[in-house]
Amino acid sequence: MPIAERRTLLYNPPLSQHEAKTNMSINLFGRVIEDNDQTRARREHLERIQALVGNAYPNKFSRTSLTGSAEGEDTITSVVRAFEKHAPELKEGERPTPEQLEAANAELSRYVVRVSGRLATPPRVMGKAAFVHLSDGRERLQIYVRRQEAVAISNDSDQSVEETESGWKLFQLLDHGDFIGVEGAVFITKTGELSVHVSTIQFLSKALQPMPDKLHGINDPEIRQRQRYADLIASSLKVETGDEPQTEGTERELSTREVFVRRSKLITAMRRHLDEHGYIEVETPMLSPIASGAAARPFKTHHNALDIDLYLRIAPELYLKRLLVGGFERVYELNRNFRNEGISARHNPEFTMLEFYTAYKDVNWMMDFCEEMLRETVQAVHGSLQLQFDGEVIDFSWVERLSMKEAIIRHQSPAWSMLDSEYFEGDWIEDPR
């Protein structure tokens, strides 16, 4: 049995009617490869590629390090941002003059790069030349192959380079979504696009499933939420048409990848602020014999070796307070909690929560500290304390303080007018500022 077919059977187990209805994980993640014309064509391409290159799933690909990127090697993004400054400045629809091309390529021809990425577009074979765009999820870079020129196939990133014209054959077997690595000189095409003139190509991995629609992405919110890997692929491949609706005064919608990156920056900024103010990060038990720390229904499990029931924690509060008793004056934990309750687009049964405790301080000090952390985090993530959301500008340079009573009365519905009565008296806090 061919390798591709064996892999298909492993990824595509038969489902019973009961499994299809009840087992969401199997239904969503088990049947990865559907049997249709497109997947059969991709499996056929994989078998032909294996016959051509031998190992169709190599362990590594060595990239150059000319651009001084944070990764320490050249990525698609670092190459585009390092060399696009050499491209002529053109208006929309305008092409560079021969003089502009000659000047730009005289400078760029000195640079030979090795980069790798996913095919962001289907290969375009135009007579004796072919083009395709590689993507690393952030930027795209066009690569160019000429049929008359020998394109070497690299079977290994460091050695065993076969100097033949088989590279052209390999290029014709590539599908949208495949991963490849290429080596070649950087240049500007006649249309003014930064490209790599390929001299060596290495096949890295085959995409056995067709890629999402590059114009519309994935519109089903259920699929986007449950299959984030597919959503990430779709958002990185999506083409901006200029027709996307955008409300005046609002920022464009972030891509899925940008949301991941901003969340990472947010977590890093919060940790940095706490660390710089003397807090110690700790990890407290996820499994507890008693569900405590909040009024919520817990997830229950059983420890076989100890033969006891345990609960996934709903909050780390009690364990953090024990550390205060033990002598730590400032502790925090940024970790997962689990609450076996409702689920919606805004509420997940498992979620990340920051909880921290400080000895010898009162509520006013804590409010000051939280405001400072909020401002530093927004500045680190957004680059400004003012940002646009839902048509309005939110200014984090100052945060209004309200008592619980004031907040409820200000935002209550008419049916809750009784709250502003003798039955709801007293302020919880006073703003000393």
What are these regions (language model features)?
Residues 6-7:
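Basic polycationic patches enriched in arginine
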Residues 11-12, 16-433:
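Class II aminoacyl-tRNA synthetase catalytic cores and aaRS-like
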